[in-house]
């Protein structure tokens, strides 16, 4: 993966005290987080000590690691900008979704795929969608459901419950 040049600049891994510099640093980190998640097809991140060993927060070439407390500040800013969302509204907030594609973008991609596959009027299970359309196999069940709920609100699909009583598929109304 091609990393941004700032990733090799040691001060990038230290929270800057000057407000203007910190604002720029947060923006650079947000771009890096979105790029890293997109390249790794990761839509959620768990904030824990193991994360400190990942290439997201640790640059082994320059021996620098972004502290988790600073990472949390950056994530909070991403949440305010709708680039991320905590999976739980209550504390502790340890897991978040990263929107390197918005819910709407995911929905549009699914609709295009359904249209290209001639699926209008047919029924599709969540499993079938993620097995056949590899672009969305990185979405966890909850995030996929959020995307499909948006499509339902727009009148594109009708969610269907399986024998377990949980939503497990949908009928394509208009792709």
From Swiss-Prot:
Q: Sorted alphabetically, which SUPFAM superfamilies does this protein's record hold? A: Winged helix' DNA-binding domain
| One Gene Ontology CC term in the entry | nucleus
What protein name applies here? Vacuolar protein-sorting-associated protein 25
Q: Give the record's keywords alphabetically.
A: Cytoplasm, Endosome, Membrane, Protein transport, Transport
Function field = Component of the ESCRT-II complex (endosomal sorting complex required for transport II), which is required for multivesicular body (MVB) formation and sorting of endosomal cargo proteins into MVBs. The MVB pathway mediates delivery of transmembrane proteins into the lumen of the lysosome for degradation. The ESCRT-II complex is probably involved in the recruitment of the ESCRT-III complex.
How does this chain assemble?
A: Homodimer. Component of the endosomal sorting complex required for transport II (ESCRT-II).
Gene3D superfamilies the record matches:
Winged helix' DNA-binding domain. Chain C. Domain 1, Winged helix-like DNA-binding domain superfamily/Winged helix DNA-binding domain
Membrane-topology annotation of the record: Peripheral membrane protein
Q: Which family does it belong to?
A: Belongs to the VPS25 family.
Biological-process GO terms, alphabetical: late endosome to vacuole transport; protein transport to vacuole involved in ubiquitin-dependent protein catabolic process via the multivesicular body sorting pathway; septum digestion after cytokinesis
Which subcellular locations apply to this protein?
Cytoplasm; Endosome membrane
């Amino acid at each position: 993966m091609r990393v941004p040049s700032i990733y090799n600049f040691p001060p990038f891994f230290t929270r800057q005290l000057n407000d203007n510099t910190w604002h720029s640093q947060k923006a650079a980190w947000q771009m890096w987080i979105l790029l890293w998640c997109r390249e790794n097809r990761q839509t959620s991140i768990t904030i824990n000590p193991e994360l400190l060993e990942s290439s997201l927060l640790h640059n082994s070439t320059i021996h620098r690691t972004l502290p988790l407390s600073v990472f949390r500040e950056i994530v909070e800013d991403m949440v305010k900008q709708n680039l991320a969302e905590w999976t739980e509204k209550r504390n502790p907030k340890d897991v978040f979704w990263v929107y390197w594609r918005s819910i709407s973008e995911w929905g549009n991609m699914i609709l295009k795929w359904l249209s290209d596959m001639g699926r209008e009027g047919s029924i599709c299970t969540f499993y079938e969608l993620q097995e056949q359309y590899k672009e969305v196999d990185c979405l966890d069940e909850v995030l996929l459901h959020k995307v499909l709920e948006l499509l339902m609100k727009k009148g594109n699909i009708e969610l269907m419950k399986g024998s377990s009583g949980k939503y497990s598929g949908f009928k394509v109304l208009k792709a």
